Amino acid sequence: MAKIEDCPGFETFGADVKAARKAKQLSRSALADMIHCDSRYLANIENEDTLPSLPVVIQLIKICGLPVERYFNPELMREESAERQRVSHKL
């Protein structure tokens, strides 16, 4: 299994999933059922930096409404952030 530190862009994936799950008022068990996995596995993803398989990542991104670019194209997100900072300074 890949390690989080070996996958740029996924450093916050677990925390993002947890925050989105709570924002949608889903229990960990309910979300685990939706992605057909054990709630302990989901807890490991959320809390212990476990990087799930690609199919599970895709399901979590869809269900939680997470921006796919953040994880699969982190450079784009950094560029957009830098551009937003430049624009906001001009406003």
Kindly give the residue locations of the regions a language model identified.
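A short, Lys/Arg-rich alpha-helix, primarily the initiator
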Residues: 1-23
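Short, charged recognition helix plus adjacent turn
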Residues: 2-3, 7, 69-91
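Short alpha-helical elements of helix-turn-helix
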Residues: 15, 39, 54-58
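Short basic helix-loop element that most often maps to the first helix and adjoining turn
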Residues: 15-30, 34, 59, 84-91
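Conserved hydrophobic/aromatic packing and binding residues within compact polymer-binding modules
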Residues: 17, 31-32, 42-45, 71
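Recognition helix of helix-turn-helix/homeodomain-like DNA-binding domains
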Residues: 35-51
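DNA major-groove recognition helix of helix-turn-helix/homeodomain DNA-binding modules
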Residues: 55-70
